[in-house]
């Protein structure tokens, strides 16, 4: 068995993330790390949303998100709605349509099973 070294990125939360390029929505998303296994790809990084228009996102992959700063208001098409604060963890199944909003700003760390950005 070949030993592989782990990866480390100091203060990754401070990296400037690329815009999601959704007109009228102040949202940024970037992959910090991408796994090497192409068959079971995992991408992890940060998502930032600022006050303004809501972001509606259709998931075609599984994702977990942990709120690391600020407060998200998150809802789905089933009528479920939560106010997620620092330390809260969310799971978005493939096929879900999620609406993200915030009264000020929020940052989440995500880990998703999808193709890299």
Predicted regions span which residues?
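Conserved short histidine dyad/triad with adjacent acidic residue
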Residues: 30-33, 43-59, 93-94
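Short acidic-glycine-tyrosine-enriched beta hairpin
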Residues: 78-94
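Short, charged/polar surface micro-motifs in flexible loops or helix N-caps
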Residues: 38-40, 49-54, 71, 116-117
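Ligand-binding loop in jelly-roll beta-barrel domains
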Residues: 94-117
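Short histidine-centered beta-strand/loop micro-motifs
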Residues: 55-59, 76, 82-83, 101-102
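Short, conserved beta-strand element in jelly-roll/cupin
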Residues: 49, 58-74
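A short, N-terminal "cap"/entry segment at the start of jelly-roll beta-barrel domains
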Residues: 1-41
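Conserved hydrophobic/aromatic beta-strand scaffold that supports enzyme active sites
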Residues: 5, 44-46, 64, 89
């Amino acid at each position: 068995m070949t030993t592989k070294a782990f990866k480390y990125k100091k203060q990754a939360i401070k990296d400037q993330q690329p815009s999601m390029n959704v007109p009228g929505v102040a949202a940024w998303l970037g992959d910090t790390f991408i796994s090497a296994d192409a068959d079971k790809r995992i991408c992890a990084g940060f998502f930032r949303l600022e006050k303004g228009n809501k972001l509606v996102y259709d998931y075609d992959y599984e994702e977990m998100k942990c709120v690391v700063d600020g407060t998200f208001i998150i809802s789905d098409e089933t009528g479920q709605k939560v106010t997620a604060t620092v330390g809260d963890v969310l799971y978005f199944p493939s096929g879900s349509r999620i609406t993200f909003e915030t009264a000020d700003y929020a940052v989440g760390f995500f880990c998703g099973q999808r193709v890299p950005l």
